[in-house]
């Protein structure tokens, strides 16, 4: 690891510490992710090798953070694995916060919301096309290149070898705000719809500059969702009452979605409602979302 000079710790990712570092030879800035992977005498576990090869494959998309290399080092006599990613200076949470807070609060420009949402759908479609779910999409792991106006998905693909924990090991609670109702209700058989739900929540948050469903526990999270969208029924979502954590919830009627996103044009509200369908099978796919009329005014040739 002499190849890289660590400049500063920039965060604790879901999977370990993240450092901003510089390649001593080229001066290129990189993000070093130190993984907490238990390596044995045999070296890197096969599950991790598989995940890394998936990451390599996925990072060929412009809208997924690029994995540059994998480095092995030794710390206290134990092997440590570092993943080396391209470095981006900010994330979508910080980007939205800059519009919400500070001396000059203002909405995000419509063209920026459209562009970022389109890029997010494109990145998610790329992952789903390779059979990979992200399962933890949130503004904090969407990295933004402000100069170029590019949004990239990070913290991806380490789903099985490095299971996404409920608590990150810094004991911060992993946020539930973007989690799909089937996951909150204990479904173990989930599919691409879990990511689309998260994309819908992120879309609404760019428009509102605050979270759509800010729950602080799994139950509170469900109640936030049910109060806005109505308590789901078997007609709407066959099998919902058989899910592990289903209870007799209070019966709420659906509210008008437009009121939560008053500045959003009708096509945008339509797309949002297609992402926030209760039945995962009825949620729009990332690929179909890219063809939605909401994006008709966007110059797609740039992507």
From Swiss-Prot:
Catalytic activity: L-seryl-[protein] + ATP = O-phospho-L-seryl-[protein] + ADP + H(+); L-threonyl-[protein] + ATP = O-phospho-L-threonyl-[protein] + ADP + H(+); [DNA-directed RNA polymerase] + ATP = phospho-[DNA-directed RNA polymerase] + ADP + H(+)
Database matches in PROSITE patterns: PROTEIN_KINASE_ATP (PS00107), PROTEIN_KINASE_DOM (PS50011), PROTEIN_KINASE_ST (PS00108)
Binding site for ATP: 10-18, 33
Keywords, in A-Z order: ATP-binding, Kinase, Nucleotide-binding, Phosphoprotein, Serine/threonine-protein kinase, Transferase
EC number: 2.7.11.22, 2.7.11.23
List of residues that carry Phosphothreonine: 14, 170
Stretches assigned to the Protein kinase domain: 4-295
Cytoplasm among keywords: no
Superkingdom of origin: Eukaryota
Sequence positions bearing Phosphotyrosine: 15
Gene Ontology biological process: G1/S transition of mitotic cell cycle; regulation of G2/M transition of mitotic cell cycle; regulation of gene expression; signal transduction
Family: Belongs to the protein kinase superfamily. CMGC Ser/Thr protein kinase family. CDC2/CDKX subfamily.
Record-given protein name: Cyclin-dependent kinase B1-1
Organism name: Oryza sativa subsp. japonica (Rice)
Gene name tied to this protein: CDKB1-1
């Amino acid at each position: 690891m002499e190849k890289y000079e660590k400049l500063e710790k920039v965060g604790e990712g879901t999977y370990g510490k993240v450092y901003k570092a510089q390649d001593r030879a080229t001066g290129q800035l990189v993000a070093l992710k130190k993984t907490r992977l238990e390596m044995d005498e045999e070296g890197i576990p096969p599950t991790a090798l598989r995940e890394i090869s998936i990451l390599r494959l996925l990072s060929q998309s412009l809208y997924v953070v690029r994995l540059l290399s994998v480095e092995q080092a030794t710390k206290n006599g134990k092997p440590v694995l570092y993943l080396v990613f391209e470095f981006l200076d900010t994330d979508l949470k910080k980007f939205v916060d800059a519009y919400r807070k500070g001396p000059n609060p203002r909405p995000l420009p419509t063209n920026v919301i459209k562009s970022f949402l389109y890029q997010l759908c494109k990145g998610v479609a790329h992952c789903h096309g390779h059979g990979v779910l992200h399962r933890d999409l949130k503004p904090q792991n969407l990295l933004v290149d402000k100069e170029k106006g590019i949004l990239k998905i990070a913290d991806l693909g380490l789903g099985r070898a490095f299971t996404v924990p409920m608590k990150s090991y810094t004991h911060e609670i992993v946020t539930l705000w973007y989690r799909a109702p089937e996951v909150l209700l204990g479904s173990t058989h989930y599919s691409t719809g879990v990511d689309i739900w998260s994309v819908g929540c992120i879309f609404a948050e760019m428009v509102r500059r605050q979270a759509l469903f800010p729950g602080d526990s799994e139950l509170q999270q469900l109640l936030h969702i049910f109060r806005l969208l109505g308590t789901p029924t078997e007609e709407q979502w066959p099998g919902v009452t058989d899910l592990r954590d289903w209870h007799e919830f209070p019966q709420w009627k659906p509210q008008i979605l437009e009121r939560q996103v008053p500045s959003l044009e009708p096509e945008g509200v339509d797309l949002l409602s297609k992402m926030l369908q209760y039945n995962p099978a009825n949620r729009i796919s990332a690929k179909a979302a890219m063809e939605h009329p909401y994006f008709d005014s966007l110059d797609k040739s740039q992507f």
